[in-house]
């Protein structure tokens, strides 16, 4: 196979931290509030601006509360579980590495007596029809390490008594979110917005706030996780008064991303960019003799974390360690040629390729990286078969 001679303009395909919005450079951060307290008037204004712009772009209902929290999406999910659980039985639905992490917390770390853990292997969604609306529920909207997303939220009752916590970190800003079905939604700045790591967002419904004020967990809650003070909802967190000190440089960076999102047409265009990225890969997969989607149901294929695996019988016959090493070499060849970075699948996922297709990735760059994946696979396979 002939080596491609056209490379992506931006070869960054990492699933986090994700590539910056087109046109980004360090000069865009020149107005950052550096050397000033995040609790100063100007500091709080910047933080509140992040909250309000996020609400407007994502079309979050006015009655939902939005807060900036530490430790990225992970911190936001942990905060929700540790503060809200203990009143009702808990169900966790997981099908990728991070969903399995939440299942570990619920099943082994939190002292919960009645927890149901519905786990499936990579590529398959669990059976949501088993859910009980009296229970609290945790799930990821999009399994970032599996490339598998939920089809819809029809399985969530509008008259539920339990709370629904959704880790939506690789879904928001690229997929339409049905807010009324969710009581807690979390995400980070580093995913679809292409901003910096370490900062998370937590969104609470009125029902979640009611739980905070009516239930005190039986376990200690560290300061960094506390969403309530003496059974009173801590509103300050949701008006720019963060629990601990955020990076004001990162705040300026995420404001740039949010302004960029507004400038291109808001949530509708963000979703369209990601959808087009997936359609480009789908068309390529249809003609591929080597690759297929990891997702087994076409309706569940993610448009952000696009995971593909070799279907080549030669590859399937390799030992597991050999498969892992082979795909590392494939991705290494692409990187050596500066045609695509960070394309290797997640360490616990089946060996393959993961292309980030979020809204900061331009469609033409996805088109340009695909021939390099074909070439690198064949190049490395020839080395293996000739040894």
Identify the residue ranges that each predicted region occupies.
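Conserved N-terminal alpha-helix of the aminotransferase class I/II PLP-enzyme fold
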Residues: 27-79, 83, 97-105, 286
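PLP-dependent aminotransferase-like
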Residues: 75, 82-137
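Active-site phosphate-binding strand-loop segment of PLP-dependent enzymes
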Residues: 121-173, 184, 192
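Conserved active-site segment immediately N-terminal to the catalytic lysine
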Residues: 179-190, 200
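Conserved C-terminal alpha-helix-loop-beta "cap" of PLP-dependent enzymes
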Residues: 286, 290-364, 368
């Amino acid at each position: 196979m002939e080596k491609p001679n056209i490379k992506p303009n931006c070869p960054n395909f990492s699933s986090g931290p994700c590539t910056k919005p087109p046109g980004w450079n360090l000069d865009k951060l020149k107005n950052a509030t550096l050397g000033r307290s995040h609790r100063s008037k100007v500091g709080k204004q910047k933080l509140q601006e992040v909250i309000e712009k996020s609400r407007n772009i994502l079309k979050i209902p006015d009655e939902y509360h939005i807060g900036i929290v530490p430790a990225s999406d992970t911190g936001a999910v942990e905060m929700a579980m540790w503060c809200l659980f203990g009143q009702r039985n808990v169900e966790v639905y997981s099908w990728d590495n991070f969903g399995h992490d939440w299942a570990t917390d619920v099943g082994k770390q939190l002292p919960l007596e009645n927890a149901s853990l519905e786990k499936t292997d990579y590529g398959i969604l669990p059976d949501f029809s088993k859910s009980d609306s009296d229970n609290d529920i945790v799930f990821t909207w999009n399994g970032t390490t599996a490339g598998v997303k939920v089809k819809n939220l029809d399985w969530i009752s509008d008259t539920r008594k339990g709370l629904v916590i959704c880790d939506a970190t690789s879904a928001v800003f690229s997929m339409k979110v049905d807010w009324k079905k969710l009581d807690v939604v979390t995400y980070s700045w580093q995913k679809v917005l292409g901003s910096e790591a370490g900062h998370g967002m937590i969104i609470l419904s009125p029902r979640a706030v009611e739980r905070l004020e009516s239930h005190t967990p039986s376990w200690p809650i560290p300061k960094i996780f506390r969403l309530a003070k003496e059974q009173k909802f801590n509103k300050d967190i949701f008006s720019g008064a963060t629990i601990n000190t955020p990076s004001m440089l990162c705040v300026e960076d995420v404001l740039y991303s949010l302004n960029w999102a507004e400038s291109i047409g808001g949530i509708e265009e963000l979703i369209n960019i990601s959808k087009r990225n997936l359609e480009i890969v789908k068309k390529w997969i249809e003609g591929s003799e080597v690759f297929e989607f990891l997702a087994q149901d076409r309706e569940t294929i993610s448009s952000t974390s696009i995971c593909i695996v070799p279907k080549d019988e030669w590859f399937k016959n390799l030992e597991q360690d050999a498969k892992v090493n082979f795909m590392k070499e494939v991705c290494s060849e692409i990187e050596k040629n500066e045609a695509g970075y960070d394309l290797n699948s997640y360490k616990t996922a089946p060996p393959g390729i993961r292309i980030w297709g979020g809204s900061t990735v331009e469609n033409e760059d996805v088109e340009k990286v695909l021939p390099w994946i074909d070439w690198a696979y064949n190049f490395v396979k020839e080395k293996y078969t000739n040894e």
